[in-house]
Structure formats: C-alpha cells, structure tokens
Swiss-Prot record:
Its cofactor is Zn(2+). Belongs to the bacterial ribosomal protein bL31 family. Type A subfamily. This is Large ribosomal subunit protein bL31. One of its GO terms (molecular function) is structural constituent of ribosome. It comes from Alkaliphilus metalliredigens (strain QYMF). Zn(2+) binds at C16, C18, C36, C39. PANTHER family: 50S RIBOSOMAL PROTEIN L31, CHLOROPLASTIC, LARGE RIBOSOMAL SUBUNIT PROTEIN BL31C. InterPro entries: Ribosomal_bL28/bL31-like_sf, Ribosomal_bL31, Ribosomal_bL31_A, Ribosomal_bL31_sf. Binds 1 zinc ion per subunit. GO terms for cellular component: ribonucleoprotein complex; ribosome. Keywords: Metal-binding, Ribonucleoprotein, Ribosomal protein, RNA-binding, rRNA-binding, Zinc. The keyword Metal-binding applies.
C-alpha cells in the first residue's frame, strides 16, 4: 500500500443552527448542520412542520377546493 495518500483524520467541531456544538471525527475541518439531536422533533418530542405544502395543497388553493 502507498504511504501518505489518505487524508488526515482528526477531531472536529460540529455546529448546528440551534447553537449546539459537539465533537466528532472527520477528514473535514468543520461541519455545519441544520438539525441535530437537540433540535430534531423525534428527540425533543415537539412536532413542527417542515413541509410548506405539496402538489395537492397547491392544486386545491389554485382551484378553490
């Protein structure tokens, strides 16, 4: 096997938009995520809608149904 061809694996910080930070291992220098275990509805028990509306809702709105 060739030496020194693999990227360096290191401890990095992961930043969520909710403000949570945690460490993990990666070849990247930093990772930013939109949803983590502190703000995901499954883990928090709070349901929030991330869907703005599908095709059916747009059709009903357009034709007044």
């Amino acid at each position: 096997m060739k030496k020194d061809i693999h990227p360096a694996y290191q401890q990095i910080d992961v930043h969520c938009v909710c403000g949570n930070k945690f460490k993990t291992g990666s070849t990247n220098k930093e990772i930013r995520v939109e949803v983590c275990s502190d703000c995901h509805p499954f883990y928090t028990g709070k349901q929030k809608s991330v869907e703005k509306g599908g095709r059916v809702e747009k059709f009903k709105k357009k034709f007044g149904m």
